[in-house]
């Protein structure tokens, strides 16, 4: 149990730092759409898609790796709370169209990236 907790801790910290770095780099590029959060969510969705595909095929992988990557890293990297706050800020500023676009791009993009990663990994490992 301690190993699992440590894996979540390390993965979550690493993912959070990666998200912060992406936000620092990409959020200033566009005032209406927080590109750092979008990038973090899309990358995280892609990584978790690969992870789930990989873990479903490789059943002998230590559970520590599973929680390090999915719950830890992807949980720290992706952020529904920041995304939600950014949408609320856009709404408060009266940017309703941008808020709606932000919701659709984040949600649909994340679903698409997870499905794409799962499909790509599954196709590349099919025998």
Swiss-Prot record:
Upregulating conditions: By fluoride, via a fluoride-responsive riboswitch.
Annotated TM spans: 4-24, 35-55, 71-91, 103-123
Description of the deletion phenotype: Mutants show increased sensitivity to fluoride. Knockout mutant displays pH-dependent hypersensitivity to fluoride ions. Deletion of pagP (crcA), cspE and fluC (crcB) increases sensitivity to camphor and exacerbates the nucleoid morphology defects of the topoisomerase IV temperature-sensitive mutants.
MF annotations from Gene Ontology: fluoride channel activity; fluoride transmembrane transporter activity; metal ion binding
GO cellular component terms, A-Z: plasma membrane
Keyword Transmembrane helix: yes
Subcellular location as annotated: Cell inner membrane
Alphabetized UniProt keyword annotations: Cell inner membrane, Cell membrane, Ion channel, Ion transport, Membrane, Metal-binding, Sodium, Transmembrane, Transmembrane helix, Transport
BP terms from Gene Ontology: cellular detoxification of fluoride; fluoride transmembrane transport
Regulation: Na(+) is not transported, but it plays an essential structural role and its presence is essential for fluoride channel function.
Binding of Na(+), residues: 75, 78
Principal location: membrane
Stretch forming the signal peptide: none
Protein origin, superkingdom: Bacteria
Keyword Glycosyltransferase carried by entry: no
Catalysed reactions, as listed in the record: fluoride(in) = fluoride(out)
InterPro entries the record matches: FluC
The protein's role, per its UniProt record: Fluoride-specific ion channel. Important for reducing fluoride concentration in the cell, thus reducing its toxicity. Required to counteract cytoplasmic fluoride accumulation driven by pH gradients across the bacterial inner membrane set up by mild acidification of the growth medium.
Additional facts recorded: Overexpression of pagP (crcA), cspE and fluC (crcB) leads to camphor resistance, chromosome condensation and suppression of growth defects of mukB mutants. Overexpression also increases levels of plasmid supercoiling, results in increased resistance to nalidixic acid in gyrase and topoisomerase IV temperature-sensitive mutants and affects the regulation of several genes.
PANTHER family named among the record's database cross-references: FLUORIDE EXPORT PROTEIN 1-RELATED (PTHR28259:SF1)
Record-stated family: Belongs to the fluoride channel Fluc/FEX (TC 1.A.43) family.
Record-given protein name: Fluoride-specific ion channel FluC
Gene, per the UniProt record: fluC
């Amino acid at each position: 149990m301690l190993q699992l907790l440590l894996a979540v801790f390390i993965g979550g910290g690493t993912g959070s730092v990666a998200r912060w770095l992406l936000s620092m780099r990409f959020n200033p590029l566009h005032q209406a759409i927080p590109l750092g959060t979008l990038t973090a969510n899309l990358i995280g969705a892609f990584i978790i898609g690969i992870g789930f595909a990989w873990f479903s095929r490789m059943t002998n992988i230590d559970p520590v790796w599973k929680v390090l990557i999915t719950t830890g890293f992807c949980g720290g990297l992706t952020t529904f709370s920041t995304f939600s706050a950014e949408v609320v800020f856009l709404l408060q500023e009266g940017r309703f169209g941008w808020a709606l676009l932000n919701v659709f791009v984040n949600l649909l993009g994340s679903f698409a990236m997870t499905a794409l990663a799962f499909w790509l990994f599954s196709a590349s490992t099919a025998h």
